[in-house]
Amino acid sequence: MSSPAQPAVPAPLADLKIQHTKIFINNEWHNSVSGKKFPVLNPATEEVICHVEEGDKADVDKAVKAARQAFQIGSPWRTMDASERGRLLNKLADLMERDRLLLATMEALNGGKVFANAYLSDLGGCIKALKYCAGWADKIHGQTIPSDGDIFTYTRREPIGVCGQIIPWNFPMLMFIWKIGPALSCGNTVVVKPAEQTPLTALHLASLIKEAGFPPGVVNIVPGYGPTAGAAISSHMDVDKVAFTGSTQVGKLIKEAAGKSNLKRVTLELGGKSPCIVFADADLDIAVEFAHHGVFYHQGQCCVAASRIFVEESVYDEFVKRSVERAKKYVLGNPLTPGINQGPQIDKEQHDKILDLIESGKKEGAKLECGGGRWGNKGFFVQPTVFSNVTDEMRIAKEEIFGPVQQIMKFKSVDDVIKRANNTTYGLAAGLFTKDLDKAITVSSALQAGVVWVNCYMMLSAQCPFGGFKMSGNGRELGEHGLYEYTELKTVAMKISQKNS
């Protein structure tokens, strides 16, 4: 049975007008308490798109108060039927479909994402995830338990309460939906901080949340900076849970703040340095293509990027040759322009960090096969770059680059490559390519990663749990397990006169 056909990709909006730049609390738009605003840039041109209200601790306090009020016993949200929560999530998905062109244009303009990818993959993923979570709303339930004695025992899965959610800049809209979808499905209220680089789609979604009919205070959105607004959420004594997607360094700060405040629940989806292993018996055409997309998709700005390619020595030279040919086919430019398949990095800081790591690869003895520098004289563009003869101790083999840079390493044996693949503090994802079923099962079970793709890469769906081992994070998003991250499990034991089996 074939998958449903993808919708045709229209032209992006030529006259996009930014309507929403304020803080969203209680289904109303607010100026920041401080009166401050911050600029939002187009990374392809380095020009200012607009200025957005800059929330900080005072605004977070207002948002948390609204979220707490909406979560009170007897509130419209707490007394709403679970099936009605599902209906609201489905309505939000329908509104996103209606505004698909606008949202995709905005994501390309503000986030540097190739428009077709934003329209098909990001919006498609958002809508599917919302509908998946909507379907779960009235199916999250406890169990009855046959306890000893004349006791009737059952469990309840209850919403945690007020959830702080801190969104990254690489997939701003998709991560927004991954966060609010399960939280709202389970009956929580949320305070969301979008990344300061990419707040625009979140603020447009706020207007859709109100239009869909969610009660005031259920979703609140406070744009601002991590050290101010993000820190205020993480350390807030009346936030019951914080969920964060971003760097491992910031994840540590959030977990520390949660521990030092009210020991709020924490889920973290953090960095990675994911191995992708190509065995000699693999279909090389498939392996080259998936490995290529695994590291170059969205300019390499993916937490699961296949940033350590291990290739068995007998096919190494051919794999490198084909990978270089593939990388050279990229057309760079404004991501809103048809035919462009690589846009800019998100900002100057990331752009310069990538170029610094590329220089380290050259200095440490890796062979630069193509790329290796800035592209153009305007915008934060980096040439698609491929390194061969990379060794495990090089910085480019150890550090998360988050850019369009492919490292290709050589291996001799299964035992050798498993040991090297696992020799990292990260454990988010891994891939392997082989036609040998025994090898596929053996290696996938040995790899220390939250998701392992076999003969494919970066295949995510709303039904499947996603998250990391080791310093790539705690907890899971998506799937049934992702919903349970937003519930507390309560046991109720009731004395009765007589128990009957």
Swiss-Prot record:
The record marks 170 as: Transition state stabilizer. Expressed in retina. Expressed in lens and cornea (at protein level). Expressed by midbrain dopamine neurons. The modification N-acetylserine is found at residue 2. It is found in: Cytoplasm, Cytosol; Cell projection, Axon. Belongs to the aldehyde dehydrogenase family. The modification N6-acetyllysine is found at residues 91, 128, 252, 353, 367, 410, 419, 435, 495. The keyword Transport does not apply. It holds the Pfam family Aldedh. This is Aldehyde dehydrogenase 1A1. The gene is Aldh1a1.
